[in-house]
Amino acid sequence: HGGTILFSARSPEFQTEEGMKKAADNMRYHGIEALVVIGGDGTYKGALDFASHHPEFPIIGIPGTIDNDIYGTDYTIGYDTAVNVAMEAIDKLRDTATSHGRCFVVEVMGRHAGYIALEVGIASGAEDILIPETPTDLDKIVEELQLAKKRGKKSSIIVVAEGDESGGAMETAKSIEGKTGFDTRVTILGHMQRGGSPTSRERLMAARFGYIAVKALLEGKTNVAVGIWKGEYTY
């Protein structure tokens, strides 16, 4: 089951004292004594704001975002599944790129982080990977593509993180086609990366994070986030 059975939404009301009081009253009414939140920066900020107004509820955070960009953990729930969904899509694009002798520029999600692009690019054998963390030299990319074509390479795949300084897949493709004349196509994978059945690694990591979160609550911890750091589960 992809997505989230808990549902997810931004609530302007929750950002007010009245909204937080309503949330606290609902928790008391339903006999909820503690809160485990799953999400990214916005979720953590909301949880801390709630804790400052209602410290009587212990709160533990579990990192959940496909971007894998939460400080304090090497892994976030959703990342591995997103990478695998993107990789499967690029494998299919490789087939048609080869058949028609085209250059495909594929944009993946990740906001300002290039983790998805980097991992899926390596895993799928992309000719180039563009990520926000490193400078993008389009002239060098064009030169590499031209050399590859001279060597007889029929097609190419370039993976671009949506937050890269190049301006994303559309701008990158325009530059490549304009400078080389290559038949270039753009594919923006978009929100399909947020769906899909979780991978086995994902399920295992989520179960471990859940266990650690409950363990932290039983030890009396509050306002901490669980994570994995250098192979060790921490909070």
Outline where the language-model segments fall.
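Short, ordered loop/turn segments at secondary-structure junctions
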Residues: R10-S11, G40-T43, I62-N68, G110, ...
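Short beta-strand elements at the ligand-binding edges of bilobed clamshell
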Residues: I70-A82, G196-R203
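C-terminal non-catalytic interaction/assembly regions of soluble proteins
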Residues: I176-Y235
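Glycine-rich oxoanion-binding loops at beta->alpha junctions
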Residues: H1-V37, T43, Y75-N84, E88
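Acidic/polar active-site rim loop that often engages polyanionic ligands
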Residues: I62-Y75, T98-S99
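Conserved beta-strand scaffold positions in the cores of enzyme catalytic domains, especially
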Residues: I5-L6, I59-G61, V105, I129, ...
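Accessory alpha-helical/coil subdomains and C-terminal extensions
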Residues: A34-G39, K45-D49, H54, Y79-D183
